[in-house]
Amino acid sequence: MGKLIDKTIDNSYANELKKQCPSSDMASVTVNIDPETSMVFDNQYYKNLVVHKGLFQSDSVLLNDDSTRKFVEDFANDQELFFESWDQSFMKLTSVGVKTGDEGEIRRICGATNA
């Protein structure tokens, strides 16, 4: 049985992903999150989402709700707005701090708690 393809993805993009990913479940296969400008920090990923070429289903569903669709469309249409928002978010994230000891742990393997 073949793998199911998200019907909301652009057909040409889905076909390209099928070419890049073998039918076996090989964990070593990687694809670019943004095939257009993969080595550049820009708003292209949002542009891709708007035309249904998002790699992650969790991002693609942002278009399903009016409140989140507006953010995707605004970031796709205004790179400076995206940069400003990213800058503010990144600065907030740097002030969170690392929880250690009884409050948390830094995992050696992301998908598993330290034993």
Regions found by a protein language model. Name each.
Residues 1-115:
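Catalytic cores of secreted/periplasmic or lumenal enzymes
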